[in-house]
């Protein structure tokens, strides 16, 4: 099938499952956070993630001024928090909906996250409508009971560790 429009691309990408993340930052430009599924590992030497952020997003000006962020991968049952950070809700309301700690980079770290990656942004690359942030991981916090949350086919799905 030849790709002819962005709707076809988006429909195809809906069939690719992804972890659900809340990306947070804090610093001179303020505190901000957004929901993202366009996050993945790049390499383990040095430990690096990439985060994609639309330059038209309301949080873009804040993230563009900061050099650190925290990738908070959501656990099962945190769908409402994902929706809150994915909408037009005021930042104070978003952060008031959960318990946060200050991570190693000074960014908000979600206490109940499946895993949190505190990162230093090492590089930014603009592609189309988005900035790709290459993030060096400086600290990791893991939840003791892994129950994942995935975004697949435009909906949330829970992942559980097999009993065997």
Swiss-Prot record:
<dbReference type="GO" id="GO:0042602">
    <property type="term" value="F:riboflavin reductase (NADPH) activity"/>
</dbReference>
<dbReference type="GO" id="GO:0052874">
    <property type="term" value="F:FMN reductase (NADH) activity"/>
</dbReference>
<dbReference type="InterPro" id="IPR019917">
    <property type="entry name" value="RutF"/>
</dbReference>
<dbReference type="Pfam" id="PF01613">
    <property type="entry name" value="Flavin_Reduct"/>
</dbReference>
<comment type="similarity">
    <text>Belongs to the non-flavoprotein flavin reductase family. RutF subfamily.</text>
</comment>
<keyword id="KW-0560">Oxidoreductase</keyword>
<comment type="function">
    <text>Catalyzes the reduction of FMN to FMNH2 which is used to reduce pyrimidine by RutA via the Rut pathway.</text>
</comment>
<dbReference type="InterPro" id="IPR002563">
    <property type="entry name" value="Flavin_Rdtase-like_dom"/>
</dbReference>
<dbReference type="GO" id="GO:0006212">
    <property type="term" value="P:uracil catabolic process"/>
</dbReference>
<dbReference type="GO" id="GO:0008752">
    <property type="term" value="F:FMN reductase [NAD(P)H] activity"/>
</dbReference>
<keyword id="KW-0520">NAD</keyword>
<keyword id="KW-0288">FMN</keyword>
<dbReference type="GO" id="GO:0010181">
    <property type="term" value="F:FMN binding"/>
</dbReference>
<dbReference type="GO" id="GO:0019740">
    <property type="term" value="P:nitrogen utilization"/>
</dbReference>
<protein>
    <recommendedName>
        <fullName>FMN reductase (NADH) RutF</fullName>
        <ecNumber>1.5.1.42</ecNumber>
    </recommendedName>
</protein>
<dbReference type="InterPro" id="IPR050268">
    <property type="entry name" value="NADH-dep_flavin_reductase"/>
</dbReference>
<dbReference type="InterPro" id="IPR012349">
    <property type="entry name" value="Split_barrel_FMN-bd"/>
</dbReference>
<keyword id="KW-0285">Flavoprotein</keyword>
